[in-house]
Amino acid sequence: MAARQIAFIELYVSEPKIAVDYLGDALGFTRVAESADDESRSILLRQGRLQMVVTAGAEAARFLDAHGDGVADIAFGCDDVTAARARAVGAGAVDLGTVRGSPVVGSFGPVRHTLVPASAEVLLPGGRTWTPLVDDSAPEQRIRLLDHVAICLEAGTLEQYADFYTDAFGLDRYSSEFIDVGGSSMDSIVVRSSSDDITFTLVAPGSATGSGQLNAFLHRNGGPGVQHLALLVDDIVAAVSEATDRGVAFLQTPGTYYEALADRFPDRSAMIESLRATNVLADRDEWGYLLQLFTRSPYPRNTLFYELIQRRGARGFGSANIRALYEAVERDRLIAG
């Protein structure tokens, strides 16, 4: 009955060509197929095991008016979709009926979970008529899979949603963190499936009245939503360099960060210089180390953004990187005004 994998992510967008070009030409996704009906037009993109559906049209209009471009659906692969729906609804999820042949339940804000049969293969999202596309323009693919989804929630609701994902979909609590930086703060809980294929980082501002980045996100987004999608790569320095050349804007990291990093990684001087050149952040956990960098949001409301992440043994999220990434977003927000 538990959710086992993420089958696809669906974005609702106002400018589909711009959104598809960003994912395809800049981030390296391949345009696989398209589908259209009276209510919408969708493009399916794929890279590694990650499928992204970009949808525009009347189906998306209400979502876009309220929230702007963003993630509308995180589809779960389940061993038994009927039992999964019953469990989720029993734990408090809103039953949204059957859409395109699959049960759908509500979650946080406007985001839904379509429930589909789990599969060892990457399958086309069901219930639509897909027409294959030939995409000769996709650059070298660096992304292997979706590492985690960061979800921004309202202050005071973090425990509620951590319990919800535990009870409704069988995810387990993995870790928690609290960050306080210059008067703004972030509370977080990580929940993860037993398969390790679903990881949600639930984040919320420490106070509903603060002026930090999470409250700013909630205001621009019209409530809770997906803050970022983290994309796992094998070589983040190459991935960032190539994506930058193709027009992806990444957050900047101050030089002083790398001076301190040299003390924490005394045997990695060559690596640190490569990280400095690409603004990539580094941290350790008890299993290894991880490298991360955030993009700027490519969407009109400056809400959803992306992360590139490389894991060299690390399974969790280093405390130093959580703080450094939070500070990077906060700096960028203050500079942008």
Tell where the protein language model's regions lie, with residue ranges:
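Short loop/beta submotifs within extracellular cysteine-rich repeat domains
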Residues: 52-53, 199-200, 210, 301, ...
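ER-lumen resident redox/N-glycosylation machinery signature
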Residues: 30, 58-65, 116-119, 140, ...
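Vicinal oxygen chelate
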Residues: 4-14, 62-85, 103-106, 144-155, ...
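Active-site-adjacent "gating/activation" loops or surface patches in catalytic cores
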Residues: 130, 195-212
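N-terminal beta-strand motif that seeds the catalytic metal site of vicinal oxygen chelate
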Residues: 1-17, 71-76, 123-162, 224-231, ...
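C-terminal functional regions that serve as terminal interaction/effector modules
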Residues: 13, 228-238, 242-251, 257-337
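Hydrophobic, ordered structural segments
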Residues: 67-140, 150-152, 298-300, 305, ...
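Core segments of cupin and vicinal oxygen chelate
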Residues: 1-52, 90, 96, 101-107, ...
